[in-house]
Amino acid sequence: MQHPAEHSPLGKTSEYVSSYTPSLLFPISRTAKWAELGLSAETLPYRGVDIWNCYELSWLTPAGKPVVAIGEFSIPADSPNIIESKSFKLYLNSLNQSAFDSREALRAVLQKDLSAAVGAPVGVRLRSLDEVAEEGIGRLPGRCIDELDIAVDGYEQPRPELLRCDAGRIVEEQLYSHLLKSNCPVTGQPDWGTLVVDYRGPALDPASLLAYLVSFRQHQDFHEQCVERIFLDLQRLLQPQALSVYARYVRRGGLDINPYRSLAEVAPDNRRLVRQ
């Protein structure tokens, strides 16, 4: 079956437009991917957000002087659509030679266009470089599982059957791995990321979690769907009292994508990690 992104700019030669062009945004419905996971808009078992950070954001003042900022865009996890990443980049590049009366005027335009594209209200922040620099590089709490010894014999498809837990021992902990990798479903390009699991419930075997995450290595899907699949597989296994799954992906084309799915309505930390 043809992937819905096949008609997007992904994998194609594109003209870079330098004047404001909102029509460049290419929405992709979440419905088909939800259906693959047995979900619908009415039955989502999680809350969450997709945080996009843009490091190549620039526009002009009315006097023609360039301005730069770092953009932070928060797309609700239950929005009808996502935005294809290359089209997002092309849209943001179209601002480069466009004049706006103020930073707030641009923020309002971005919020209007992005909300229209995804079909839900999008949070938009335009942050100064000094503000972001003061935050520094984020360090994850919890336990890194990357040094555990595991044997791996398959990389093509996620393997939830690898996951194990101790139903007789209830814990509250955070586990993370920097070894998450999947591939773009259209171009095959690698997507590198860090995956954080925060939960309260039956003790998850960390080696089994690592083996499971490595099984995504040749899997082709968008960032958002990978995180949703991981969330659902862990929820089915653990039946936890609390669960959140957060991926911090390495940037491409000046954008990084950070999907967060949780049983609770909690705003995730958006400080960038060392590879971002």
UniProtKB/Swiss-Prot annotation:
Keyword line: Cytoplasm, NADP, Oxidoreductase, Queuosine biosynthesis
Cellular component terms (Gene Ontology): cytosol
One GO BP: queuosine biosynthetic process
Reactions catalysed, as given in the entry: 7-aminomethyl-7-carbaguanine + 2 NADP(+) = 7-cyano-7-deazaguanine + 2 NADPH + 3 H(+)
Binding site for substrate: I83, E84, S85, H223, E224
EC number(s) reported in the record: 1.7.1.13
Active-site residues, record numbering mapped to chain: C184, D191
Entry's localization field: Cytoplasm
A GO MF term: preQ1 synthase activity
InterPro entries tied to this protein: GTP-CH-I_C/QueF, NADPH_dep_7-cyano-7-deazaG_red, QueF, QueF_N, QueF_type2
List of residues binding NADPH: S85, K86, R252, G253
Pathway where it operates: tRNA modification; tRNA-queuosine biosynthesis
Domain of life: Bacteria
Enzyme class: oxidoreductase
UniProt similarity note: Belongs to the GTP cyclohydrolase I family. QueF type 2 subfamily.
Cross-referenced NCBIfam families: QueF
Assembly: Homodimer.
HAMAP family given in the database record: QueF_type2
Function in brief: Catalyzes the NADPH-dependent reduction of 7-cyano-7-deazaguanine (preQ0) to 7-aminomethyl-7-deazaguanine (preQ1).
Name of protein: NADPH-dependent 7-cyano-7-deazaguanine reductase
Organism for this UniProt entry: Pseudomonas aeruginosa (strain ATCC 15692 / DSM 22644 / CIP 104116 / JCM 14847 / LMG 12228 / 1C / PRS 101 / PAO1)
